[in-house]
Swiss-Prot record:
UniProt cross-references to SUPFAM superfamilies, sorted A to Z: ATP synthase D chain-like
Keywords: Acetylation, ATP synthesis, CF(0), Hydrogen ion transport, Ion transport, Membrane, Mitochondrion, Mitochondrion inner membrane, Transport
Cytoplasm among keywords: no
One Gene Ontology term from the biological process aspect of the record: proton motive force-driven mitochondrial ATP synthesis
Name of this protein: ATP synthase subunit d, mitochondrial
Organism: Schizosaccharomyces pombe (strain 972 / ATCC 24843) (Fission yeast)
Pfam short name (any one): Mt_ATP-synt_D
Length: 175
């Protein structure tokens, strides 16, 4: 991994990524699992790189009485060729995971875009709204025609309190 990619990976606050991007639980757990497997692989690679890879057969020949065994082992090591592993199945699994993660990311992008549009429209409405001091009763009647009927019904029944007002805002009466 390049130094830039490594530094970028360390700079990310992975704990808050899921909440900030509003990822679903499956995507967040998949990212966490991938990060833990990556950390294990990096640790294993570090330990393997620290190990010595050469064998001093001359030392073993001088120490051991049976030099034939040392010769066999040396010839076996020289003739050793690592097994080539077909990585296609693993690459397919990685590609499938990547496709699923990409699909999840695209869904999240669409959700965020929709939410941003909704919030932008709401903000625009708030910015363009008249102050409440400038709104008249006639404006209210035009905006919500049924309000006049509701108020008339409340007045004829002698109800002077809006239902739910006290529960929401408390009782402001002094007496």
């Amino acid at each position: 991994m390049s130094k830039v990619a490594s530094a970028a990976g360390k700079a990310i606050d992975w704990a808050s990524v899921a909440s900030k991007l509003k990822l679903d639980a499956a995507t967040a757990s998949a990212i966490a699992n991938f990060r833990s497997r990556h950390a294990q692989a990096v640790a294993k690679l570090g330990t393997l790189r620290e190990q010595a890879t050469t064998v001093d057969f001359a030392t073993y020949r001088s120490v051991l009485a049976n030099k034939e065994i040392v010769n066999r082992i040396e010839s076996s090591m020289k003739s050793f060729k690592p097994v080539k592993i077909d990585l296609n199945s693993q690459l397919k699994a990685i590609n499938a995971f990547e496709a699923k993660a990409s699909e999840g990311a695209k869904k999240n992008v669409e959700l965020v875009k929709a939410e941003l549009q909704n919030l932008s429209a709401t903000l625009k409405n708030i910015e363009q709204a008249r102050p409440t001091e400038e709104i008249t009763i006639e404006d209210m009647k035009q905006a919500v025609p049924e309000i006049e009927k509701i108020v008339e019904t409340m007045v004829t029944k002698g109800k002077w309190v809006i239902p739910g007002y006290r529960e929401k805002f408390g009782d402001l009466s002094i007496m």
